[in-house]
Amino acid sequence: LLHSNSITYWDYIHTDALLGLQIQRTNLPDEMVFIAYHQINELIFKMILWEIKQVAEGESLKVDVFQDKLMRISRYFDMLTTSFNIMREGMDVAQYNKFRHTLTPASGFQSAQYRKIEFASTELINLIDIRFRANIDRDTPFEHAFEHLYWQAAGKDHKTGEKSLLLLGFEKKYKDEFLRYMEEYNTINIWQKFKQLPDADQKDRELVNAMRHYDYTVNVTWVMGHLNAARKYIDSGKGSGEATGGSDWKKYMLPKYQKRIFFPELWTKEEIDNWGENL
């Protein structure tokens, strides 16, 4: 209180502005659930990026600080995973299949913050579509690597190279920003910061477990929570079977297809081979 003027809760949180951002495109009541839920996700993504930034920019990080940041991030993803019940049980399927058509080609696929979380977590090679990894390395130009990221499969016909409106709009808005971000975090992503620790710290069992927990939470637990929520609506038999935006959602989302693993060196061959299986 000695360092600030008095302020009200609503001014500090900007409640009026925050609560004025949920703008529906239809008069279907459950669209409000869909909008607010995704906005909450974006706020949590912002908090995750805030923690990652502190790791990336930290000098001479101690094991306990590194571990604390990882567990903070993991708890955010744990919360996001359990919150999928809000989506899965909180919307009427018939309403969803009506208002979803007003969203095209918008999609949660187009969350720029989530892409940044991925770029800031791991080596770029681990985000490349598994079909193209053999021909890409650290010397590959960022733009070429960008064209072969795993999520391009959700919006591109790799036989013709033609991109969907979903992907074209996303790239028009964010591609330049992504390329700068990819380059910035190339040497300060979470994996690089881990490898910069002293050897003894890299072998710290609690830190390794925190790294593994974060990896599995993001790339399997959270993804499957998202997939299971999507299945209820997309595979309900009451709609077209396409995701919002028309993405190839099964190939894009199922962990076993793309083997998205942030820290493969921390997993055994058997664990990697069975990644995303038997869930």
Walk through the language-model features, giving the residues of each.
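Surface-exposed peri-terminal alpha-helical interaction modules
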Residues: 1-279
